[in-house]
Amino acid sequence: MIRIFAVCGMGLGTSAILKSRLREALDATGADYQLDVSDASAISGQRADLVFTSNELAERMGRLSARVVVINNFMDREEIRRKTADAVAAFE
């Protein structure tokens, strides 16, 4: 099972939007996954395989052992689908 987090800077609002888009993309891959949300300050205490976040926050996550995937536009389903498929393929 792949442990995945959607991370935003201030709380759960934008990460909930990203989580919804990620769920669509992950379901299309057929991967076995667990998807949660976190804010940037709390992610370092989580065990994760993949972290999806914005470019601004990705710079703060250099110390994570998880692979960080940058999403430029949380509303762009195609970008999320493509980057999710690429990230999940690394676990196959």
PLM regions and their residue ranges:
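Conserved active-site segments centered on acidic
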Residues: I2-D39
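Short, hydrophobic beta-strand segments that form beta-sheet elements in well-ordered domains
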Residues: L35-D36, A48-S54
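Structural alpha-helical scaffold elements that stabilize or flank donor/cofactor-binding regions
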Residues: A42-S44
